[in-house]
Amino acid sequence: MPQPTSSDVHVDAILSNMSVAYMQEAYAFVAGRAFPTVNVQKQTDKYFTYSQADFFRDQVQRRADGTESAGTGYSLSTATYNAEVYALHKDIGDQTRANADIPLNMDMDATRILSQQMLIRQEVQWAADSFTTGVWGTDATPSPLWDAASSTPIADIETAKNTVLTNTGYVPNTVIMSYKVFSALVDNSDIVDRIKYTSQESVTEELLARLFGVDRVLIMAATYNTAAEGATASYSLVGDKDVLVCYTPANPGLMVPSAGYNMVWTGVSAGLGTGAAVSRYRIEERKADRIEIEAAFDFKIVSSALGYFLSNCTS
């Protein structure tokens, strides 16, 4: 069966921009916000990592007159990333388009469902890569759990911050939690008692950030259907009952430490410079137009010591 050639496939800037805007407005998803994004020109490549141990030694010495100063240095190693390509399409048949009240809306609707599913794929992938045990410098479980009357979530977060600070020299500035954990904290006495005499605010991400002493709290509120197409829908939240306390900079840099980076390959966007692109092309033998979304990314943990993972925070 004939296939479209590369010259037939057109990355649609309008649909791509609409897809990017939709992704940016989907606040239930944290994958695109958890780590700084690094746009990369190559799908897979190496990057340098600096020795943390060398940077944190106390090697400055007194200098006697006429003598050399003490010397130091640092070692470099390399790590790799691989921005896997993910894609999905939706075909719009000519008969379906002809029967539509507003034909243009069919392209927009296709872009929306493709964008939604790309968001889900990114969120599920980020959770599998980064929101789990065994990948960060420290794993712990609060005791008591945070839905218990005697629990101390503020102290538990402070313990996490102190651990990361001791091991890296950086105070964590980000707390990422599942919606199940957030729901438990809304009625947690350790939280509520701190604000009941001083504020009429309800418990929000911003209020938790102030109580925890971090720049931001991100709530994982994305849900998805785990059942196969045609089966009875079965919905599940992406995040379970866990919390990640980590340090991430506002902007990536060559010598800027971060718990992780989102490596985004721009090669799929045909010059738009984004990590996701929407193409539209003709499938003549099917008498249909194909709308296709494609993205390439790798959620890369760069420094495991800059993360502290709290699992099973509620019962």
Roles of regions detected by a PLM:
Residues 2-62, 77-84, 145-151, 192-315:
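Sequence/fold signature of self-assembling virion shell proteins
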Residues 42-64, 92-111:
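Charged, low-complexity, helix/coiled-coil-prone segments
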Residues 76-100:
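Short acidic, glycine/tyrosine-flanked loop/strand segments centered on an H-E-D-like triad
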Residues 88, 97, 182, 224, ...:
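Generic "edge-of-domain/loop-turn" microfeature
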Residues 64-66, 178, 213:
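Glycine-centered small-residue hotspots that permit tight backbone geometry or close packing
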Residues 67-71:
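Hydrophobic, aromatic-lined core segments that form the binding pocket/scaffold
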Residues 94-174, 179-196, 314-315:
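Alpha-helical scaffold segments that mediate packing/assembly in large oligomeric complexes
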